[in-house]
């Protein structure tokens, strides 16, 4: 539901007011006062709507209206109030008796704007035009720069090395450690890993191959190795004691039991015929 019209507009006049209409409106208001603007046109004998009668009276027919041009004092008041209130022309008109809001608005758009521009002042912000242009050009354009740390060669780490004071043993525990900042490459070069136990226990394997039995020097080498690898080299060691000397000549030459041994020389538990 919209607002109801102020009057029936079917049989109302539109356009400029005539002098006869102005005089009828003045005479009625002087005799009866303003009253209700919706019923006033019919009572005054005017073929106008109530809104048209109200605007005609306030803006043109009031007896307290000032006629003529605006003074310099009124111009300064309008400029000061506009800088504070903006385009609230009805409030500005309240500070200027005899001036209407419509009159002040028209005067602002036709005269005061040009006056402010000639002074180098922006009519909207009431600031100097030069400062407005300089601030607009002086604002730097900040570009969003992204830093990519994914391809950095080495990531920095903080390595805390405990340090003790020989002179003062009663220092606080918070001062016992000092942190040194270094890269991963430097820390790896400074700290050498301890040798693994597997590398210590694994013996060196002799790769010299021979068809015969191992010699006495090779046996001495095997004895000097770690005890943990002795079981592995027991397979290559000759027996410590030979139960009995055995001569091949006993069977080949037909020597009997109890006869004198031959001239064979023993070599590592076996006999070689001379």
Swiss-Prot record:
Compositional bias per record (Low complexity), positions renumbered to this chain: 163-184
PROSITE patterns: HTH_MYB
Domain spans labelled HTH myb-type: 9-61, 62-116
GO MF, any single term: DNA binding
Transmembrane spans: none
Cellular component terms per the entry's GO annotation: nucleus
SMART domains: SANT
Region (Disordered): 157-201
Cysteine pairings via disulfide bonds: none
UniProt entry keywords in alphabetical sequence: DNA-binding, Nucleus, Repeat, Transcription, Transcription regulation
DNA-binding region listed in the record: 37-61, 89-112
Tissue localization of expression: Expressed in flowers and weakly in roots and stems.
Presence of the UniProt keyword Transport in the record: no
Pfam families reported for this sequence: Myb_DNA-binding (PF00249)
Biological function: Transcription factor.
Record's protein name: Myb-related protein 330
Organism in which the protein naturally occurs: Antirrhinum majus (Garden snapdragon)
